[in-house]
Structure formats: C-alpha cells, structure tokens
C-alpha cells in the first residue's frame, strides 16, 4: 500500500500490527477486512491497527462477527458466504471510488423497470441484464436462473402478464456500490391472473396495492 498505487484492500491482515510504524508511508485509500475469530489476528491486534489508523478517514476497517480466518475463500471450512459478499461489496466500492467505472445504478434500474412495465418489451428488458441473470420473487418462488429460463418466465408469466394499469409508486431507494434496494408500492387492478404474485387466484376486478422491496445486484463492468 506504500508503492504509489491508487487503492489497496487487505483481507485478514496477519502481522500488520507489527509494522504499524510504516503506516505513514501508506498514502492511498485502504480497506481492511478482519475475521472476529481469527486466531492469527486476535482482538488485541485488531485494536492496535484500528487505533493506529483512527485519524485516517480514507482507511476503512471492518470486523466480521462469527467469522474465522479465510472466511472469504470458497471451499474452506471457514468460508462464510454472507460475510464474503459484504466484504466484496465494500472492496468494490473502494475500487470504483478510486478507479471507476462510475455507473448510475439508479438509472440502470429505472431503465429495466421501464421496459418491464411501460414498453413491456421482453427483449429490451433482457438487454438490461447480464448474460446469466437470476430473478427470484421470494413469496411465490417464481422467476428464473439463466438467460433462457428467465426470458421464458418474463415472456409467459411476467412482462406480458401484468394488468394494463400496473404502476410503481416509489417509497425509498438505497444505492450501494453494486446493488440497489428499492422500496415501492406495486399497484394494479386485478383484471387477470398474476402468476408471479397471486398464482391460482382468478381476477377479482379489485384495485390492489402491495408493498414490495426489490434487491437488485449488479455484476460486470
């Protein structure tokens, strides 16, 4: 981190507490990920590191509760997927702040929703996604994994299956480095059966408002 690079990310940080006299040579943004139960970096060592960098706003230090050494390594017994994913998001945020690219994730998500609910164009909707997308509507466990399965779902059960007056009322939107969490109210008149939301329920003709939370992850460049 003191070799004139733009940004550095550190996992586990074994032995860092023994070389803290070199910290002034670190001039780039730095993110450190520690495991709470790591015997190689006990709490005392982590506290020394945190104390040494407490006046550095460009240094972020995270400890992941209940995790052990190598929590970020798939295939290891200590692998912890939730912690690894969170660490990945924080690392990506640091890299993008320093190096880019800088995407407008909110705009990308709006474009996706526009083609889902306004133009109702399956091909245009699919074009906003990665080559191997994944969608899961948790309450009914509907969606698709992979391009072909998801396109089939969108074509026969989603994009062309929503009532004509369907609309989204935004409530709150949280934007991270690699995801958007969108809270909204999904509004429609129940004029047709909606497979992905109310499967098996014949149209009632009633106006319906359903609160929804969409967690949208972004991959690639």
Name what the model sees in each region.
Residues 12, 34-36:
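N-terminal Rossmann-fold cofactor-binding loop
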Residues 1-27:
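Primarily recognizes the serine-hydrolase "nucleophile elbow" in alpha/beta-hydrolase
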Residues 42-52:
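Short alpha-helix in the alpha/beta-hydrolase fold that links the catalytic acid
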Residues 53-72:
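Catalytic histidine neighborhood in serine/cysteine hydrolases
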Residues 36, 69-72, 76-220:
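C-terminal and inter-domain tail/linker signature
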Residues 37-41:
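Acidic catalytic loop of the alpha/beta-hydrolase fold
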Residues 5, 28-29, 55-58:
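A short helix->loop->beta-strand "cap" motif at the edges of active sites that frequently abuts
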Residues 26, 31-34, 64:
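Short beta-strand/loop motif that positions the catalytic acidic residue
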């Amino acid at each position: 981190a003191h070799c004139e690079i733009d940004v550095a990310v550190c996992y586990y940080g074994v032995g860092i507490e023994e070389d803290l006299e070199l910290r002034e040579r670190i001039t780039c943004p730095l993110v450190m990920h520690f495991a709470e139960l790591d015997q190689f970096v006990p709490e005392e060592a982590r506290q020394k590191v945190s104390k040494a960098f407490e006046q550095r706003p460009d240094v972020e230090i995270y400890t992941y509760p209940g995790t052990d050494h190598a929590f970020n390594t798939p295939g290891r017994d200590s692998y912890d997927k939730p912690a690894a994913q969170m660490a990945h998001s924080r690392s990506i945020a640091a890299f993008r702040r320093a190096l880019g690219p800088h995407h407008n994730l909110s705009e990308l998500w709006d474009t996706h929703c526009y083609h889902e609910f306004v133009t109702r164009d399956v091909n245009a909707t699919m074009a906003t996604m990665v080559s191997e997308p994944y969608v899961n509507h948790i309450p009914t466990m509907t969606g698709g994994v992979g391009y072909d399965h998801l396109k089939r779902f969108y074509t026969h059960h989603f994009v062309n299956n929503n009532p004509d007056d369907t609309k989204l009322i935004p409530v709150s939107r949280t934007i991270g480095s690699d995801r958007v969490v969108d809270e909204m109210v999904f509004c429609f008149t129940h004029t047709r059966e909606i497979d992905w939301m109310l499967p098996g329920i014949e149209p009632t003709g009633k106006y319906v408002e359903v609160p929804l939370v969409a967690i949208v992850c972004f991959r690639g460049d």
